[in-house]
Amino acid sequence: MGQVDAGFKQMMEMVNLSRLSNAMRAAGIMRRALLESLVHARGRAAFSGPLLALPLLRANVLEMLLDVEAAASVVFSSAAVFDRWNHGSAEDRQLFRILTPIAKCWITARARTVTSEAMNGRGGNGYIEEWVNARLVRDAYLGSIWEGATPIVALDVQRAIVREGCHEPLFAVIGGRLQRVTEPAAKPWVDLVLQSVESTRRRIDGWALLAREEAELEAKPAADQLYHLLAASLLLHEGQVLRDRVQDFRKLFVGALYVQRWLQPRDSSAPAFSARDLGWLDAIVAWSGLPASALRRPHA
């Protein structure tokens, strides 16, 4: 049954496993939503061509794809940490403690956006029950409520940081992955992530000086930022592995676009992606090999 004086802590370990399962479910829902959007956009013609040829729709699909690939990387890597901890790795317990609420907080909430965009892209057909989109939206909303609504889970991320210092092993893992990204064309993007890690660390260190109400307001932005740092490090590292094995720059490009979308400072009125970025969408979707020239330096 466990220790009498550690009931809540033991219960939270069970909840954390359930949260990982919930995040993985949401990642699968997002992938289905992306597939539905691609099938529709390729098959539906408008303005003398397929919908997927239109820049705004391509931008929506690309953003959905980034969300899907990042979520898959996060849940699978978190599951690997759980396996190590479950086989006796004490050092991974602290890491798993913060990974699960981070993943649950962002992925299940983001699934609401991705499924809604997929429904919107299909138009009126997406709203009616003859198509899968309406069910995907409902299921996405349910997932963000299970095992704690988003604000509650964000506060749990903050507790894991303040009470257990779980952000330190997380930052160490992120930094270790980024050190293994040796492709020169990816270095500017790696540097952007490392800069974001340091600014996030300073922000967290400043919580001790805040009143409780002010500190709690920091919980959700911090949880979101930690997710983006984790996801970016995973995508870039996976991209390095893919490049080393088959000289394919696809995943490095996806990682760079993720950093560009979520971590690089930009004018909020500017588009998230350039026409050049969108030009690679078909190759990314098809998992065709991308050349090194796909990677470019971040905008100043």
Report each predicted region and the residues it spans.
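Flavin-dependent oxidoreductase catalytic core characteristic
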Residues: 1-300
